[in-house]
Amino acid sequence: PGHQDFSEDTYRTLMAADSAVMVVDAAKGVEDQTRKLFHVCSLREMPIFTFINKMDRDAKNSFDLLEDIENVLGIHTYPVNWPIGSGKEFKGVYDRNSKKILAFTANNGQKEVEKKELTLDDPALEDTIGYYHKQDLFDEIELLDGAGDEFDLEAVRNGQLTPVFFGSALTNFGVEPFLEQFLQLTTPPLPRETVDEKVEPMSDFFSAFVFKIQANMNKAHRDRVAFMRICSGKFEKNMEVFHVQGNKKMRLSQPQQIMAQEREIVDEAYAGDIIGVFDPGIFSIGDTICSPGHKVQFRGIPTFAPEHFALVRQKDTMKRKQFIKGTSQIAQEGAIQIFQELDAGMEEVI
C-alpha cells in the first residue's frame, strides 16, 4: 500500500490468487492504493485477511482503525486478536479464541522478540502489562464481545467479513499466529470461469493461465519466464499441452517454482500451484494452456488505462532492430503499453 507503481502488476497477481492478505499501517489506516486493490478483490469476492502492522510504533486507536476499514472499504471486520496499547506502551495482544494474552517485550534491536503467554486470571498479568492496560483490556473485550460482529466463516470466504490481526512484522510479533490462522481459514483452490464453463480444481484435465511474464531473472544469461496458475488437473514435466492463443501443441520445458532467488525444478504440480516455464517469446499475459483433449479458454486479464506517457525514439538509427525488440519485450511483460500512429513505423512511439 502507498506504492504508486503497485497496482497493475499486483492486480494481475490477484487474478491468480484465491485469497489476499491486506496489510494496514497502524499509524495511517487505509491508503489509496489499498482502496484500489481492495476493489479488485471485492469484485471477485475474494477472502481478505487483514494484518494491522507497526503496533510497536505510535498508532491510531484500534476501534478507529476497524471503523476506517469498514467505512472506506465497505467490509465487516472481526478482530481475532486485540492489541494492548501501542507504540512504546505496546504490551502484546489478546487472542479472543484461546482467551490468552501473548505478551510483547521490548526488542532492544533484536529482529524477533521473546513471547510470553498469560491467561486473563494470571496473577502475573498486572505486573506484565500494567494496571491501566489491564483495566482497558477488560473493558475493550467486553465491548467487542457485546457490540462487535460475530465470526462467520462463510462470510469470510465470500469476501464479506475480514478477520483482523494486530502485530509488528519488524519484530516478528503476531506474525506466526496470523499465518497459522490464515492456513485454517483460507479456502482451497476455487473454481475458475472460462468463456464457456466453470472449471473445477478437481477436474481430470490440465488447465492453467499466464498471469505474469518476467525477463532476465537469471543474471548468468538472458532468460524469460512465464508464470502460470494451475486451475485444474495435474501438471507433469515435459507433458504435451495446447496453447489456445497460439493454436498449437507444445511441451513446457524447465518447469520451476521460484521463491525469491531460489529456483526449484518441479516434476509435478496441482491446482492452486504457481509454476514458471521458459518462454521463447510465444506467451502473453492472460493466455490459456490446457490438455489437448479438453480445450478451454479462461477469460482474459483486463489492462489498466495508462497514467504516464512518454515519446520514445532510438538515438542510434543503426540499432532499430534492438529498439523494436526491446520495447516489444517490455510491453509483452505488461510493464508498459505501446501506442503508435496508424501506418507509422516504430521510429517514434508513445
Predicted features and spans:
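Structural and coupling elements of P-loop NTPases
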Residues: 1-350
